Amino acid sequence: MAVTMTQFGALPAVQFTAPDGAQATVALFGAHLLSWKTADGVERLFVSSQTPLYGSKAIRGGVPVIFPQFNVRGPGLRHGFARVSTWRLADSGGDNGSAFVELVLDQSDLAPEHAQAWPHQFALTLRFTMHGNALEAGFTVRNTGAAPFPFGVALHTYYDVGQLNATTISGLQHQQYTDHELNTRIQDYPALHFNEKHDRLYQSTSTLMLNTASTTFNLSQQGFTEWVVWNPGQVDAAALVDLADDEYQRFVCIEPARVDQQPLAAGAQWTGRHRIGI
């Protein structure tokens, strides 16, 4: 297992390699997983060619860390401050063929405007582990203060699917979802296909399969309460300045989430886990 400091664009980053040759790169900015290559050298995550990589704006691609609120479901910064704060490398290592890095963030790491807007004592720990053809993320939120605070959380993973029109998601049949127009429906078909914009919040934690022309990703979660599935489609993609017009055809976002603000008691902690297997 090897760990080296490197750069991704202008961002300081940690690159770690498993004994089988699998490799991942995590920026300190946002604890943002920017690259995951399995032992065969194939990149599994999508990062936009147009995204800023200099540490002042959120990154389009990889795995953005959403905390303490999802989207605008809270009073603060959209999708929270975790993805635009600089984390610290706390630990790294591995055994039995695995490799991991662990990053941390607390209130002392925040920019003054973020600390003022969200005046709570907290500690975040995010550990990425590679083992074989699998990547696991373990995300822990601790309330280190004397009063409860509400929070939402998600890991907004962008998968490189190559060809959107050859991509499906299975495992969501009979599950309830809310779409971008706030319509609530039940998915009555076995596989979700992508031929238009999708922005769905599924009230489900079932195991999913993301099927592409060349790969099947097996996705599971613990501790979270929903799956979010998103692709902007052609029209919305054209309005995103940090995404090339045709890049929407290369990715699908599937994220484990707890989108609503839920209280965490003083001294308590919450842990969510997400596993991606190939």
Segments predicted by a language model, with ranges:
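Extended, loop-rich substrate-binding clefts of extracytoplasmic carbohydrate-active enzymes
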Residues: 4, 8, 77-131
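Acidic-aromatic substrate-binding/catalytic surfaces of carbohydrate-active enzymes
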Residues: 22-78, 252
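Beta-strand elements of well-folded, non-transmembrane domains
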Residues: 107-109, 128-132, 143-145, 157-161, ...
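Active-site/ligand-binding surface loops and adjacent short beta/alpha elements
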Residues: 148-150, 154-228
